[in-house]
């Protein structure tokens, strides 16, 4: 087992933390019970979880639901780290990530150019995680250091789009960074 191999479990994962296309909206109280269950199961297995990842594979998260759920978790378990796994199915993924950033979340799942999806989401519009390059760009503009090179991420996103042969949902790969736009503007003025 993972324990026999010295692989500690450090994170619990709460699936569908913000809602489900089959069950509908899930109450904060239900999610808190699931967090408690994850914490209890870890202790029974001989581990202490350092964090909980809240997942939203079906795209239900909004800034308000992120604020409400993280606030409730932090009021009950202030020492627990929180990570977010957000999909942009309904166009609120980046806004939900922004809310998480404002609340001090430092771990986010993202995918190049928004690759991925949720095959069990019961909707035709289930897209992948928030776009890595879009999220890194937003962080950079906010003064949050990610250690990522946004220009290189844009190159990789364009390659990914070529490989899959269809448009992918990334934005900054089309619009470019503000740094690049400002440089182009200065060149035009100088000419």
PLM region spans:
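Catalytic cores and adjacent flexible loops of soluble metabolic enzymes
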Residues: 1-191
